[in-house]
Amino acid sequence: MQWTDESIAFLRDAAAMNRYYETIAERIAPQLPENAHVCDAGCGIGELSLALKPYCHHVTAVDADALAIKTLKAHLIEGVTARCGDMETLAPEKPYDAMVFCLFGRTQDTLRIAKKQCRGRIFLVKRDYSHHRFSAGKVSLGEYTAESTEAVLHEMGIPYTVERFTAEFGQPFRSLEAAERFFALYNRSRSETLSRDEIKARLTAGPSAEFSYYLPHEKALCLFTIETAAISKEEAV
């Protein structure tokens, strides 16, 4: 996605309100080797990168969006490095011990990148539902789902483990107008839009005086764990 100041502000509000990224990091943590150098591929503004740091030696956060990386650099903590560029070309000097692809990339692409850049496990976090949640109409997520990932891995004969879980990632709003801007920003329908009344019907009372509205979103996710050694060179082409 193309990051904007507004989309970044929305996500930072949601991340501060919920333990979404912490929950994902906690699921990955037990499977990380000791003192690991972990890559958060397609990190966005780096909320997951920061959440992963307590569980490893170093996190390298990579994203192609300059504004997203600029935002992360403004909130960096010790042990996290932010790099701006294409994952395909920003290979590390030494292979990563682990790589995380959270809601990022086609499965085939992530396998190819991981084979070249990682010597250990890779973690794919995928949506465990089939349609976009913030659109006016029914918009398919296509191949960016857990079901699609499982089909690809089965077809390629790559062994994996999978863990299904949920994490609350609702969106707080300071006003109804902010909620309208959010739905306009994330609506993937080509012709349909939500009215103010339809938007209001999706909202609940906000958690504080600052945030008077809240959009609940218990996100169903799948965590796929794959050993890089199980990916053949032919499959990584």
Would you name each region that the model predicts?
Residues 4-20:
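Class I SAM-dependent methyltransferase Rossmann-like catalytic core
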Residues 18-35:
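Conserved alpha-helix/loop element of class I SAM-dependent methyltransferases that forms part
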Residues 35-44:
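Conserved class I S-adenosyl-L-methionine
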Residues 45-86:
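Class I SAM-dependent methyltransferase SAM/SAH-binding core
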Residues 89-94:
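Short conserved loop adjoining the S-adenosyl-L-methionine
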Residues 97-111:
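A short SAM/SAH-binding and catalytic strip from SAM-dependent methyltransferases
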Residues 119-132:
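Conserved beta-strand signature within the Rossmann-like core of class I S-adenosyl-L-methionine
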Residues 164-237:
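Conserved Class I S-adenosyl-L-methionine
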